[in-house]
Structure formats: C-alpha cells, structure tokens
A protein has these predicted regions:
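Conserved N-terminal beta1-alpha1 strand-loop-helix module at the mouth
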Residues: 1-81, 122, 130-140, 208-209
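Glycine-rich phosphate-binding active-site loops on the catalytic face of alpha/beta enzymes
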Residues: 17, 92-103, 142-155, 196-217
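Generic structural signal for well-ordered alpha-helices
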Residues: 29, 33, 52-53, 83, ...
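Glycine-enriched alpha-helix->loop->beta-strand junction motifs that scaffold or abut catalytic
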Residues: 58-64, 87-94, 117, 138-144, ...
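Glycine/small-residue-rich loop that forms an oxyanion/phosphate-binding "nest" at active or ligand-binding sites
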Residues: 60-115
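Conserved anion-binding
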Residues: 95-168, 172-173
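C-terminal helical cap(s) of enzyme catalytic domains, especially alpha/beta-barrels
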Residues: 111-117, 157-160, 207-233
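Catalytic cores of alpha/beta
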Residues: 126-139, 184-201
Length: 233
C-alpha cells in the first residue's frame, strides 16, 4: 500500500475504457470534476494512457489513474507500461486486474510492490470472494469487488455479495476501502450500494450509454453524497 496517497470516502470511479478519448473525454471529465467539487466527493478516472497528461492538467478534484501498469523496471520491455512513465505523465495511481485486463495473483502482488516503490496508488479488481481475500492480503490502496458476469449488464451485485465482500476485506485490512462495481446504471444503484456499506462505487456503460452522460454522471455523484450523508447521520 502506497502510504502517501490520500483519498476520502465516499469516492467514485469512472472508467472510460476505450469508449472515449481526447477532447470528448475531457469535456465529460470537466463536468465530473465540477460535480465532485460541488458534492465534495473524490473521483477516480482511468483514461487511455495518452490522455493521462491531458486530464492531469485540467482536473482539480479528480484523481487520474492509469488503466494498467506492468511490474517491470526501466530497461527492456517494448510494449509494456512502465510505472515510472505513467507517474511522470501525471497519474497518481493505477487500476490492476480488471476483467478486461486480467493478470494472475503473483503478477498482481509484484505490480503492487512496484507501484509502492514508485509512488503510485493501486486499485485492484476482484471477482470472487476468494480472489478478493487473496488480493486484500497484498495491501493495495483500494479494491473493486466486481462480479465479472455483471459488468455492463445494468444489473448490480446482490446485497449479499456487497456485504460479504466488504466484511471479508475489512477482516484482513480495515485500511482498504472497497468499491462495489458492476451493473451500476443509475443513481438509485449508487445510493443502494453505498447504503449497503460500500465506501465507493463506479460506472462505465451507465454513464457512457446514457442519453445525457453529463447529467447521469452528476446524478450518480449526487446519489453518492446523499447516501453517504444518510448513512452517517
């Protein structure tokens, strides 16, 4: 775990994947950044590697993360993603082990260690309870509990999954904040998962495929704030 990194609950992750880039991504990111300031929530955005400097230059409340890095050190490794390079580009962290970019547990652990050395926060995705427990023992900054089968479906995780995965991580390392992902398609989903005990949630298709992505993003961040405040009355 990179100890010099700070992010506060509740937080939100928007992953544009390969749907958005350049100016179109920047326009949406600016709206998200403004909403993050308005609702006093932290937001992670994981742009294409080439857009890291663009977003890092313009964001105030948004944390810019890489979509992935490799565990290599400077030297040979054509086609690989060097942790030092994404940090130099302006990223403060990286996602690892997303369902669309899976790596094995040994590689996850090695990459977390490299990121700790370089000074990058890590948000690591996990599908099953067993995978989640194994990753929690490696000490990432953040964990995404996300059933692979539900990604992009519009169907959120069951409340049993939400509660059990949060409890499992907290039993291993209470410092790790758990983001509940997969199937978050509307503000109501955001509200429900935060009320169930999550520190965070996120969305890709729910925002990108919305009739008005900017309005959907704002609505989700408002729901995040409302649920957190309701939970902590």
């Amino acid at each position: 775990m990179y100890k010099n990194y700070k992010i506060s609950a509740p937080y939100f992750e928007f992953g544009p994947k390969a749907y958005l880039w350049g100016d179109e991504l920047l326009r949406l990111a600016k709206v998200i950044d403004e909403a993050a300031i308005e609702y006093d929530v932290d937001v992670i955005i994981t742009p294409q590697y080439t857009d890291i400097p663009l977003l890092a230059k313009h964001m105030k409340r948004v944390h810019v993360y890489a979509q992935h890095v490799d565990a290599l050190v400077p030297g040979r490794g054509l086609g690989s993603v060097l942790p030092e390079a994404v940090k130099y580009a302006g990223a403060v962290g990286t996602m690892l082990n997303h369902a669309e970019c899976k790596i094995d547990l040994e590689t996850i652990e090695a990459t977390i260690k490299r990121c700790d050395e370089v000074g990058l926060a890590t948000i690591v995705c996990a599908d099953t309870l067993e995978e989640l427990e194994a990753i929690a023992k490696m000490g990432p900054n953040l964990i995404v509990a996300e059933p692979t089968a539900l990604i992009g479906t519009g169907t959120p995780s069951s409340m049993d999954y939400v509660v059990s995965t949060i409890e499992a991580v907290k039993a291993i390392n209470p410092e790790i904040m758990v983001l509940q992902g997969a199937g978050i398609s509307k503000p109501e989903d955001v509200y429900n998962v935060i009320m169930a005990g999550a520190s965070a949630t996120g969305s890709t298709s729910g925002i990108i495929k919305a009739e008005d992505p900017c309005a959907m993003a704002r609505g989700m961040l408002k729901a995040l704030r409302d649920a957190w405040d309701e939970r902590h009355k």
